[in-house]
Regions:
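Second-shell loop/turn segments in exported
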Residues: 3-8, 20-29, 134
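N-terminal export/assembly leaders
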Residues: 14-19
Length: 203
């Protein structure tokens, strides 16, 4: 047997993404549990909004049972804006009564390179002021984070992904940066950064 694919209205989808999620190969004995595992793996990639595996009725003389995978991809690009307010008082605030407001934006791409890679970047900024003593702005904060997630295990665990029946597998690289100014605490600038490489798998 062979694996073929036909795409309509989708210009950026790597065929390797489909073959990587298959839990069976042409010529294998029929096993419904492997079909179910394949559908779960396709759903777990986050690329598709609809997945279905349908069996084709074979000829009476044909011992093979062909299957068709019907997939519908999600909208690739998403942008979200957010606003928020916060109020602090007592030991956690720079003044007796501090009120702050902020703005944030998030961009997401569920299929960055065509292989199911999920990219997300988020940035927020906020300002706080003394509303009790009318002392003006008391603090400012800026935070940004970015992550890139693969729907499979990368080096050095890629072989484990290929030779085991995992319900879901994911590798993620993430970065975060934070900078803040606190006038009342005599801190003119505070910065913090972090990086993380994480593997997730479910059997």
């Amino acid at each position: 047997g062979a694996i073929t694919a036909r795409m309509q209205g989708e210009e950026k989808l790597d065929f390797d993404l489909l073959t990587r999620t298959l839990q069976f190969r042409p010529g294998d004995r029929y096993d419904q549990s492997r079909l179910i595992a394949t559908k779960r793996r396709l759903d777990a990639t986050g690329v598709f909004s609809f997945t279905a595996i349908d069996a084709q009725i074979p000829d009476s003389s044909d011992v093979r049972l062909s299957h068709v995978l019907n997939l519908q991809t999600r909208v690739r690009h998403q942008i979200r804006f957010e606003t928020f307010m916060q109020q602090r008082s007592g030991a956690l605030a720079d003044t007796e009564n501090e009120l702050g407001a902020g703005l944030g934006v998030t961009y997401s791409n569920v299929n960055l390179f065509g292989g199911g890679e999920s990219f997300r970047i988020r940035s927020t900024g906020s300002l706080a002021a003394d509303i009790g003593g009318f002392g003006g702005f008391t603090s400012a904060q800026w935070e940004s984070s970015a992550s890139l997630s693969y729907p499979y295990l990368t080096f050095p665990f890629g072989r484990l992904d290929r030779f085991s029946r995992l319900y879901d597998a994911r590798s993620q690289v993430s970065l975060s940066l934070l900078a803040a100014r606190r006038d009342a605490l005599k801190l003119t600038l505070r910065g913090r950064g972090g990086a993380r490489y994480r593997f997730e798998l479910r059997h």
